Every structure is written in C-alpha cells, then in structure tokens.
C-alpha cells in the first residue's frame, strides 16, 4: 500500500481589498495528513484530533475532494486518509482549504502527478463548496501554489502566483469561531461605491 505524509498550510485570504481573490500561505499552523492508496473504490477517513469532523466522505471536505478525484480517474482506486488538524475549524485561517488542498495534492502524488495545479485547485474547490456553499479558491490557491496568489477568475480558472519577498506575518486571532458559510450570509451581495 502506497502512503504519503504531508503538511498542508494555513492560509490568509481576502488580503486588503482582495476579497475572494488574494491569499497567502503560512508556514504555521499546518494540518498533518497521511494518505494511502487502496485497491478498492472507497474513502476511509480517520481523525486524530478533538474537532469531531465528519468521517463520512460525502460530509468531509477532504473526502469530497478524494471522491471527485476517484470519479475523474475512473473510480477503480480508493483512499485511506488520516487527518490531524492543527488549524482550528472556523478560525479564519483556511482550515477547510488545508484539508481540501492537502487531500488533492497528496492523492495526485500517489497517482503519479497526473493532474496540474489548476486541476488540483478545481478538485479542492469542491471541498470549499461543501464547507461554505460556494466554490472559491482564495485559500485553496496559496495552499496548493504556495506564497501569494491572485485568483483572477474561477470560470475559467485563472490563478497568478505573485512574487513576494521573504516576510514575517503576524496573525492576531480573537479565538472566536465563525464558519465561512455563516460569514458569507452576513455579507451584502452588492456593495455600492457611493
């Protein structure tokens, strides 16, 4: 059984005026993930943390990503995923993106890197849709590409890596939980400029 262990980084998105388009990857925190290839079409998920996230693959952001990859490859393979979350869900630093992107990148590696980064973003956006109700890539793109990214479009997908100097980032967190889906419901659909 082939297995890979990865770390999937937290991210900060909605940088300055870049709502849903600008994001950057952080060195820490990062989720630990171990993914194994199975010879039968199923997804098994184990959690090694206290967040009680769903282990049913259709209700888990990483599980949805793995299912979409299985569908694209013909469904003759499966995955066993163990997640150790170090990014608290609802923390605002890309917890769902780390799970979704990490699953996509790890699966791609086990499959011989058959998908491009853009395709991995597309798979991972399925996880974000489960988490927030909307496919968006502002956290997914930096998680997969690294560094700072600009999502110019998701239809068609157009992502630009932005060169950035080495820098230190300080994240001040009020330790409250706000789920992305809830935060999106508060936002107005249109913002007037006057």
Language model segments and positions:
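Short, glycine/charged-enriched secondary-structure capping and boundary segments
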Residues: 20-22, 97, 185-187
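Short, conserved acidic/polar surface loops in the N-terminal third of protein domains
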Residues: 91-95, 153-154
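Patatin-like phospholipase
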Residues: 98-127
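ATP-dependent small-molecule kinase catalytic core of the GHMP/sugar-kinase superfamily
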Residues: 116-194
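Short glycine/threonine-rich catalytic loop with a Thr-x-Gly-x-Asp
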Residues: 93-98, 193-194
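Generic structural signal for well-ordered, non-membrane alpha-helical segments
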Residues: 15, 55-62, 97-100, 117, ...
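ATP-binding N-lobe of GHMP and related small-molecule kinases
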Residues: 1-91, 105, 109-115, 146
């Amino acid at each position: 059984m082939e297995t890979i262990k990865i770390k999937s980084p937290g991210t900060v998105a909605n940088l300055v005026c870049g709502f849903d388009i600008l994001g950057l990857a952080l060195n820490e925190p990062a989720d630990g993930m171990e993914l194994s290839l199975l010879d039968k079409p199923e997804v098994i998920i184990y959690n090694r943390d206290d967040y009680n996230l769903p282990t049913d693959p259709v209700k888990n952001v990483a599980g949805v990503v793995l299912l979409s990859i299985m569908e694209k490859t013909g469904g003759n393979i499966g995955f066993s995923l163990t997640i150790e979350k170090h990014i608290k869900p609802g923390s605002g630093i890309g917890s769902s993106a780390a799970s979704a992107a990490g699953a996509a990148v790890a699966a791609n590696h086990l499959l011989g890197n058959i998908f491009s980064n853009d395709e991995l973003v597309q798979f991972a956006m399925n996880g974000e849709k489960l988490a927030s109700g909307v496919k968006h890539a502002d956290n997914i793109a930096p998680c997969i590409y690294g560094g700072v990214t600009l999502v110019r479009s998701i239809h068609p997908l157009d992502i630009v890596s932005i060169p950035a100097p080495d820098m230190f980032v300080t994240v001040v967190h009020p330790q409250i939980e706000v789920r992305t889906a809830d935060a999106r419901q508060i936002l107005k659909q249109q913002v007037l400029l006057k």
